[in-house]
Curated annotation (Swiss-Prot):
Keywords: ATP-binding, Cytoplasm, Fatty acid biosynthesis, Fatty acid metabolism, Lipid biosynthesis, Lipid metabolism, Nucleotide-binding, Transferase. It is an enzyme of class 2 (transferase). Pathway: Lipid metabolism; malonyl-CoA biosynthesis; malonyl-CoA from acetyl-CoA: step 1/1. Acetyl-CoA carboxylase is a heterohexamer composed of biotin carboxyl carrier protein (AccB), biotin carboxylase (AccC) and two subunits each of ACCase subunit alpha (AccA) and ACCase subunit beta (AccD). It catalyses: N(6)-carboxybiotinyl-L-lysyl-[protein] + acetyl-CoA = N(6)-biotinyl-L-lysyl-[protein] + malonyl-CoA. InterPro entries: Acetyl_CoA_COase_a_su, ClpP/crotonase-like_dom_sf, COA_CT_C. GO terms for molecular function: acetyl-CoA carboxylase activity; ATP binding; carboxyl- or carbamoyltransferase activity. The lineage of its organism: Bacteria, Pseudomonadati, Pseudomonadota, Betaproteobacteria, Burkholderiales. One of its GO terms (biological process) is malonyl-CoA biosynthetic process. This is Acetyl-coenzyme A carboxylase carboxyl transferase subunit alpha. It comes from Polynucleobacter asymbioticus (strain DSM 18221 / CIP 109841 / QLW-P1DMWA-1) (Polynucleobacter necessarius subsp. asymbioticus). Belongs to the AccA family.
Length: 323
């Protein structure tokens, strides 16, 4: 699959294009230009390292939305075995922006739930671009309750711009569905391990992200609103999205500094989409280490740990500033 380059990666794109041209020439002739190819490849790698070491929050947002970034079904295929998808909320419909089902992780039975955006136009429409309606969240809630019944851990993968804001979603009580999911996650008697793999957009993300362990990929985002949405409200124009991204503090490093997540999962150089194998290996270790935290932990201890975690959010200290 040919890599899609973002606007700020155009220098890398030009180098990679030259490398491809040289490889074609070498394949079609007897001329040995392997040294030139090696030199350009090293230059491209170093340039990628330099650019990705200094990404702005707005650039991180673009990487988090990259169309070739691994989605939930990619992680399901790369990390889990015996996946059996379960459908529907048993109330209204099967929202395909959220997928979920029974699986095994390192031979251990588990439940997997996550957003799915879609790769092409047809699938994106089917998945509603990863923006869930109430029936999607109710499906997730049903699967969480099923995991509790079977006493198996829950793995969630978050990648959504936010909950769908359409009239039909509001008619079916979108806010209640999200709020109910938060309630259920707070009292669920099995471990929940949540990972932000792309966009973590507002309540639409939080509805399946209230984990006992919360991970974030290095170039993912987690925020109450998108940069464009924030800019449209504050400055009446989406052109200020870059400035809004700076103010929102949506990067993994910023969220970790606030104590809202537990660990940042490293991505391959150039983003998760550049090397699926490396990304899967990094993710497998992060999930495995997280799951070991709950080995032998009793339900009461699990719930106490979770409630302490939730109650620690939003604490502040008053200080007196001398004039």
């Amino acid at each position: 699959m040919k890599t899609t380059f973002l606007d700020f990666e155009q220098q890398i794109a030009e180098l990679e294009s030259k490398i491809e041209e040289l490889r074609f020439v070498q394949d079609e002739s007897s001329v040995d230009i392997s040294d030139e190819i090696k030199t350009l490849s090293e230059k491209s790698l170093q340039l990628t390292k330099d650019i990705y070491a200094n990404l702005t929050p707005w650039q991180v947002s673009q990487v988090a939305r990259h169309p070739q970034r691994p989605y939930t079904l990619d992680y399901v295929g790369g990390l889990f075995t015996d996946f059996h998808e379960l459908h529907g909320d048993r109330t209204f419909a099967d929202d395909q922006s959220i997928i979920g089902g029974l699986a095994r992780f390192d031979s251990q039975p588990c439940m997997v739930i996550g957003h799915q955006k879609g790769r092409d136009t047809k699938e994106r429409a089917l998945r509603n671009f990863g923006m869930s309606r109430p029936e999607g969240y109710r499906k997730a809630m049903r699967l969480m309750r099923l995991a509790e019944k079977f006493s198996i851990p829950v793995f969630t993968f978050v990648d959504t711009p936010g909950a769908f804001p359409g009239i039909d979603a509001e008619e079916r009580n979108q806010s209640e569905a999200i709020g109910r999911n938060l309630y259920v996650q707070a009292e669920l008697t099995v471990p929940i391990i949540a990972t932000i793999i792309g966009e973590g957009g507002s309540g639409g993300a939080l509805a399946i992200a209230m984990g006992d362990v919360v991970l974030m990929l290095q170039n993912s985002t987690y925020s109450v609103i998108s940069p464009e949405g924030c800019a449209s409200i504050l400055w009446k124009t989406a052109d200020k999205a870059s400035e809004a991204a700076e103010q929102l503090g949506l990067t993994a490093q910023r969220i970790k500094a606030l104590g809202l997540i537990d660990k940042i999962v490293a991505e391959p150089i150039g983003g998760a989409h550049r090397d699926y194998d490396v990304m899967m290996a990094n993710m497998r270790k992060a999930l495995s280490d997280s799951l070991k935290t709950f080995d032998g932990m009793k339900e009461d201890a699990l719930l106490e740990r979770r409630h302490e975690r939730l109650m620690s959010y939003g604490k502040f200290k008053e200080i007196t500033v001398k004039a």
